[in-house]
Amino acid sequence: MGSLRLSTVAIAVVVCLSILLISPTEVDGRQVCDYDKGECNSYEKSSTCIEPCKQLDSKFIGGRCIPVGGITGMGLCVCCRDVQRGAEKESM
């Protein structure tokens, strides 16, 4: 019973730290991937997050699946936006 509780806590800590480390994630210095779209399977192609993110809002230019579950294949789908494009829209 105690080892089950300890492993549950360990998994929760790993997931939380992974989320903190990837949020926000910069890609090529122009894109920021900081909107959590939900869970994804990190073993599948990363393109599984691209279309759902683009359909969510026009400010998103894509998305990617970031592994957070280690060997379980659990991932976090994050949507990416162009920082320059977002700044231009806000100034209008």
Swiss-Prot record:
Family assignment from sequence similarity: Belongs to the DEFL family.
GO biological process, one term: defense response to fungus
Domain of life: Eukaryota
Compartments where located: Secreted
UniProt keyword tRNA processing, yes or no: no
InterPro entries registered for this protein in UniProt: DEFL
Annotated Pfam families: AtDEF-like
Coiled-coil segments on the chain, per record: none
GO CC annotation terms, alphabetical: extracellular region
Signal peptide interval: 1-29
Record's keyword terms, sorted: Antimicrobial, Disulfide bond, Fungicide, Plant defense, Secreted, Signal
Designated name of the protein: Defensin-like protein 96
Disulfide bonds: 33-80, 40-65, 49-77, 53-79
